[in-house]
Amino acid sequence: MDNKRQEQLQHFWEQFHLPAIDLEGLDLALTHPTYAFEHHLPGDNQRLEFLGDAVLGLVVATYLYQHFPQLPEGDLTRMRAAVVCEASLVKVARRLRVGDLLRLGQGEEHSGGRERPSNLADAMEAIIGSVYLSGGYELARDFVLQIFTPALEILSDTSFIDSKSALQEFVQSQGTENVVYKILEEWGPDHAKGYKAGVFLKNRLLATGLGHSKKEAEREAARAALALLKVQG
């Protein structure tokens, strides 16, 4: 790696104010298969992408498990998927200008590869993988939580006073039809009932919520659905 490239990567990493990492690994994370092929390099970022995908999933799953103790597994799964999906990764990559750092083959470069969503998402996962290999799980966790702060803050926002109205306003602003609430389960004696509500959009279950009354369960379902829709953007 020449000095210019090293300075470029060092500048990128310093913005996070985290312990130093192996810049060779970061460079590999930004190496597209077409570049590796054209320059006869022994590796590209695909294996790091595989590793980073697993690390990202674990970090986000742990965060959701700790911050949403009342949510069932199905909602946690949907929330994790919203955070780690390609669209979310691309948002992060563009905010960090990862495309400027990619090493691409000539054909990929000339066909818009620096802004191609799949390239940006793959590179973000590969970067996470390289951080994990360089500094271990704790450093990778700190990195992931920092770069995904906007998405995680949306999920953690419990300030929706009237979550049902807020959800309805949001879906109407997107030009879609009204949401529908259904009580999916109820249990317990009359003096201590528990309810599970689901909120549906176009017959698709968005999220569920639990409560001691039907209205409380519906509000919790609306809050979870609103967070998911905002993250998916």
Curated annotation (Swiss-Prot):
Domain RNase III, chain residue ranges per copy: 9-136
Swiss-Prot/TrEMBL cofactor(s): Mg(2+)
UniProt entry tagged with the keyword NAD: no
Any one of the GO CC terms: cytoplasm
Subcellular location: Cytoplasm
Binding site for Mg(2+): 49, 122, 125
Enzyme class, UniProt record, top EC level: hydrolase
Entry's Gene Ontology BP terms: mRNA processing; regulation of gene expression; rRNA processing; tRNA processing
Gene3D superfamilies (alphabetical): 3.30.160.20, Ribonuclease III domain
EC id: 3.1.26.3
Active site, renumbered: 53, 125
Quaternary organization: Homodimer.
Membership in a protein family: Belongs to the ribonuclease III family.
The name this protein goes by in its record: Ribonuclease 3
Species in which this protein is naturally found: Moorella thermoacetica (strain ATCC 39073 / JCM 9320)
Protein's gene: rnc
